[in-house]
Amino acid sequence: MTAGHGAQEWDSRYAGSDRVWSAAPNAWVAATLREWFTGRALDLGTGEGRHAVWLAALGWRVTAVDFSTVGIERGRAGAQDVGVEVDWVVSDVRTWEPTAGETFDLVLVAYLHLEDDVLARARTWLAPGGALVVVGHALRNLTEGVGGPQDARLLHTEAEYREASRGLVVEQLGEVVRHLPDGDAIDLALVARRPWGDQ
């Protein structure tokens, strides 16, 4: 999801092709989460649900949120194809809130580019020991990489990710380069964990 594009625009985009994104998870997401112990996961801005379905196949209990009805329907079909259960929620991540008292062992935010402070809200939904895992296009990608939003306000810096994870223990923060046929894309990745003793 990108700011400036509403649910109708994303519905049209998803309806216009077989898949907008790959059905496989992002390589960095897969490498980072593949060996983690499973629990409750939230995929915020799930799009067509590729990460939600992949996490569910690993054994996570997943809630996936996106404002695109078409994207959610694609995710639902993908989950059915591989025989996994996901709690699909059609809602705008800028206003969605979990049920009172509901927390997650993992909040995944992949390529969600908004001006709203979604990450700061997402960190409050972590269970003790839970992790906020974020990957998106880095600000440097605008001038030195390929793809992604062409609006600097929607791209991120390490300082912004650090601020968004205030109160969490940052385990990983830095750029990740994806080699694509038309050049390199520069992403920014974060893993930040709520301390176990934080009640």
Give the positions of each predicted feature.
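Conserved class I S-adenosyl-L-methionine
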Residues: 1-37, 39-47
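Conserved SAM/SAH-binding beta-strand->alpha-helix loop
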Residues: 68-70
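Conserved SAM-binding strand-loop segment of SAM-dependent methyltransferases
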Residues: 81-93
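A short acidic, Gly/Pro-enriched loop at the edge of an enzyme's catalytic core
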Residues: 98-106
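A short, conserved alpha-helix within the catalytic core of class I
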Residues: 113-125
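Conserved beta-strand signature within the Rossmann-like core of class I S-adenosyl-L-methionine
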Residues: 129-137
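Short alpha-helix
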Residues: 153-167, 173
